[in-house]
């Protein structure tokens, strides 16, 4: 199990330290890595077990020497990523590790490095940490509260007791380093911890030194500081305190933070105006202007009296000497309070309101309902402000805003960040631009940009993959540990002063506290103490006063240096921003040139395309003209075709009417033919009847002649009767034959007439057929011509559709007419057949009845009439229509089929 292997590795490390003296943490680091691979996130149960094991090890192992404490610190640094801490664990570790190590004056720097790594892991975390949230926030609050309390107490002791300052320098350096880098990531939490300490006057300078360094590092959340009330306390400090060094720190803090909170000043803007009024009314001889009561605010009067009162080894005479020193140096420090930067930033942020306030402060205060607590001279204020105003350029707000709109318009700050605000202030200060980049010692500041960049490694905001155990183990094991730069060093005064001055400058450059530079003063004192062992108490007190005075000078210089570094940092950031903008402008310019060349190329292409478009436009216009011409031609042709169609329709209607008239004539002719055929049949029947009768008569005559020859001697009476009958029969037969001949002649004439008319009608029908065929040929030729023209015109496809549609419509109409005609023709033929059948039946009936009527009178006259009657009945059973009639009907049908 990874947990058991980890516990075993912990015990092995301590066992190796007891036996050999030089433990190896490689095995422990490997076990920690394997445990993290097995449990990527913190396990609460395993974390509790590991904490119990660590408590058991701490209770069983006597950590009574520095080596074991260093080992214990290294072990904690290795296993802390596996733990889930709470307030109780932080309190136990503070009593076991943090406070003893931080309070030890002889501690090694690698120990402080590992200690800071553990503190950074506890303090700085992601909000979305695996075991973050309220639990880790409580641990961070408990730790930072204890660190702030320890730092404040050590700083007050360090400023008050100059004898033991060097022993606390390393501790204060570590505390300041932790607090500064915690404040960079969590400025709101740090300023909240400083609020209740800031009410105590001796703590204000140490607290402001840390906060000024935090703001100088330009963290990401500096705008959260006014939300805690610490900003209000600093404004009160600038309004009521009288210590020049404290006011210089407060002024530096205000100047540095204003660029981050310029959009949320509100009522504090009027307080800033009053602070400027107070600073401008400072007189080097009389001091600060008189003011009203400060309420419950405890005023910090001066540096010497405040921190001299914290020591108990000074006498009244020494305090009077110190007071004399303070009084003699007070004007110099008052003159060093430069408020021109405050004028520049207030003029850059709210120029209209600021100048209106300077014109008449009382009127402006009554207008905006706030109180000015200081007495001031309007002429002196105008004189000093005119000199500062002459160094600045005209602001653009004078053209854009009024006094009211300048206060209410917050949108103008959304386009500016803190670097842009500082750049705006510097751009308006035409005279102070060159002066602000110079070093206070007369030279230029270093040109490296590494100091102004954000902290890296553990000092930076930890990322998700941050692992404190993966850092190199920084513990060294010297045989004879010692502290460099101690009071017993054998260096000379000049070398010590030079080296410690350089060390102080380097340490200040990296953001340490004011106590780092004091080591040079103590080095001087150590050198003098080693050379002069018989100093009196009076000389020692005067030396302490001198050291405190030099310490105050050093604090002034440190504050000025921090502010100059801040200005330099802002300049460098602005230069970097301008350089980036310049690079961007160059890129934009190159892109613009490229776009111009591309634009020119595109213009040439556009001109070429325009010429081609004009050419195509002219061609399309010509094609359009041709199309219009073709459309007109086709429209004219279509109109002509429509006219022809109308003529064809009229001709068709005329032909239909003529056909109908011909059909009616044909019907009448057919009827007459039927009648003629019927009469012909009747005549033929009569002729046959007469022929039979004639034959009978001839037979009868032959019989009579024979009978005459045989019976020659018949009586006269019978002979007379027979002769009378034969004469009657002959007379009747002759009359009948004459009448039949006349009827035959008339019927033959009528038949010839009908045949001639039939031939004439057939000729007319043939002519009509030929005309129709000729018309169809002409129409088809025209249609073929139109189709050929339409197919040849490929550039005018829009004409095909209407012509094709018209052609299809005409064809559909013609096919429909033909179908209707075929239907009518079939119906006509059916009706004609039915009519002929009915006519045949009628003729049959007539033929059957007429012989009966004609022969009824001759039945009783002679026996031969019975035979003729039988013949007539047999003839009636023959086909109804004779050959002439069948021929006429066939010809009429053939003519209709051809039509």
Curated annotation (Swiss-Prot):
Keyword list (alphabetical) reads: Coiled coil, Cytoplasm
Report which residue ranges the record marks as coiled coil: 540-706, 737-847
State its location(s).
Cytoplasm
Checking InterPro entries in the record gives: ARM-type_fold (IPR016024), Hamartin (IPR007483)
The biological process GO terms on file are:
negative regulation of G1/S transition of mitotic cell cycle; negative regulation of TOR signaling; negative regulation of TORC1 signaling; positive regulation of L-arginine import across plasma membrane; positive regulation of L-leucine import across plasma membrane; positive regulation of L-methionine import across plasma membrane; regulation of cell cycle
- What are the record's GO terms for cellular component? cytoplasm; TSC1-TSC2 complex
Citing just one GO molecular function, the answer is:
GTPase activator activity
Q: Where along the chain is composition biased (Polar residues)? A: 889-899
Locate the region Disordered: 874-899
Free-text function comment from the UniProt entry: Together with tsc2, required for uptake of various amino acids from the environment and for proper conjugation. Involved in induction of gene expression of permeases and genes required for meiosis upon nitrogen starvation. May act as a GTPase-activating protein (GAP) for the small GTPase rhb1.
Q: How does it assemble?
A: Interacts with tsc2.
What name appears for this protein in its UniProt entry? Tuberous sclerosis 1 protein homolog
From which source organism is this entry? Schizosaccharomyces pombe (strain 972 / ATCC 24843) (Fission yeast)
Q: Which gene name belongs to this protein?
A: tsc1
